[in-house]
Amino acid sequence: MAAAQAVEEMRTRVVLGEFGVRNVHTTDFPGNYSGYDDAWDQDRFEKNFRVDVVHMDENSLEFDMVGIDAAIANAFRRILLAEVPTMAVEKVLVYNNTSIVQDEILAHRLGLIPIHADPRLFEYRNQGDEGGTEIDTLQFRLQVRCTRNPHAAKDSSDPNELYVNHRVYTRHMTWVPLGNQADLFPEGAIRPVHDDILIAQLRPGQEIDLLMHCVKGIGKDHAKFSPVATASYRLLPDITLLEPVEGEAAEELSRCFSPGVIEVQEIQGKKVARVANPRLDTFSREVFRNEKLKKVVRLARVRDHFIFSVESTGVLPPDVLVSEAIKVLMGKCQRFLDELDAVQMD
């Protein structure tokens, strides 16, 4: 019985010890364990695999992906970071820039501004095409000139009172429709995601006048095209108490974990510790610093239970980003199958 439990732990858990981590490699491949059928089975995979949405709001999504290998989960994460397309500033035509910010620095800063535009409605621009059309390009104009405020108090030292337009924000960017874009997109549909991003600061007489071309691209080419502020996953914590923990030890154990992980209950006049919500734990392993408590707790992670956190830059809702990432992954799989078929035909 103990041997069977040890094998099951090796197959399904990553165990965190005081000085190291065990069972970090996937070992459930065919023939590795006697008595286990680890051959690929589509029906078994469909039965065990599931996706549970835990939390979703306008810009963030947390969901569980259960029953899949780390290689596939990591591929999905990397696709979110680098292969889901967005629209971003690619070309900046500077007509006049007398600000303290150099042209090339200003252009780079503009490129990192998230643009609220659905990339699925646009095509990739052809290589070498400098002009752009309504199907592959968005155009923005930025024209701001700083002047003195004639109504400012004489003894004022506040720039906000002394000057007009001394701060250039993304709200000063104006969309210039190309072709029939004005008919296709309603007012306010094409804009910077945030209107309060500071671009530059000016003083009286200084001016910025430029034209921006936004194109479709992916984060693998440049980070400005990445649709997520972060996309990460962690394995589900699995915390087991090997023996009852009571009294002051229960309170001490609770303090060793993140709030809400260990709950102290009153049972027949005694304080008793129980694992309430292991999902909340960050695995600081603080419990291993306590000589008494480190022997009564086993810390592990469930090998095939991934907690994904996706935070959108605001270009697209996070659930749409996840759907697009799945489509990209399916396309990669299909191309691989097509290549295999082509090799077999040869």
From Swiss-Prot:
Record-level Gene Ontology MF annotations: DNA binding; DNA-directed RNA polymerase activity; protein dimerization activity
Residue list for modification N-acetylalanine: A2
GO terms (BP aspect): DNA-templated transcription
InterPro entries according to UniProt: DNA-dir_RNA_pol_30-40kDasu_CS (IPR001514), DNA-dir_RNA_pol_insert (IPR011262), DNA-dir_RNA_pol_RpoA/D/Rpb3 (IPR011263), RBP11-like (IPR036603), RNAP_Rpo3/Rpb3/RPAC1 (IPR022842), RNAPI/III_AC40 (IPR033901), RNApol_insert_sf (IPR036643), Rpo3/RPB3_RNA_Pol_subunit (IPR050518)
GO cellular component terms attached to this protein's record: cytosol; fibrillar center; nucleoplasm; RNA polymerase I complex; RNA polymerase III complex
Keyword entries, A-Z: Acetylation, Cytoplasm, DNA-directed RNA polymerase, Nucleus, Transcription
Keyword Hydrolase recorded: no
Compartments, as annotated in UniProt: Nucleus; Cytoplasm, Cytosol
Oligomeric form and interacting partners: Component of the RNA polymerase I and RNA polymerase III complexes consisting of at least 13 and 17 subunits, respectively. Pol I complex consists of a ten-subunit catalytic core composed of POLR1A/RPA1, POLR1B/RPA2, POLR1C/RPAC1, POLR1D/RPAC2, POLR1H/RPA12, POLR2E/RPABC1, POLR2F/RPABC2, POLR2H/RPABC3, POLR2K/RPABC4 and POLR2L/RPABC5; a mobile stalk subunit POLR1F/RPA43 protruding from the core and additional subunits homologous to general transcription factors POLR1E/RPA49 and POLR1G/RPA34.
Function of the protein: DNA-dependent RNA polymerase catalyzes the transcription of DNA into RNA using the four ribonucleoside triphosphates as substrates. Common component of RNA polymerases I and III which synthesize ribosomal RNA precursors and short non-coding RNAs including 5S rRNA, snRNAs, tRNAs and miRNAs, respectively. POLR1C/RPAC1 is part of the polymerase core and may function as a clamp element that moves to open and close the cleft.
Family per record: Belongs to the archaeal Rpo3/eukaryotic RPB3 RNA polymerase subunit family.
Name of the protein: DNA-directed RNA polymerases I and III subunit RPAC1
Organism this protein belongs to: Bos taurus (Bovine)
Highest classification ranks of the organism: Eukaryota, Metazoa, Chordata, Craniata, Vertebrata
Gene name of the record: POLR1C
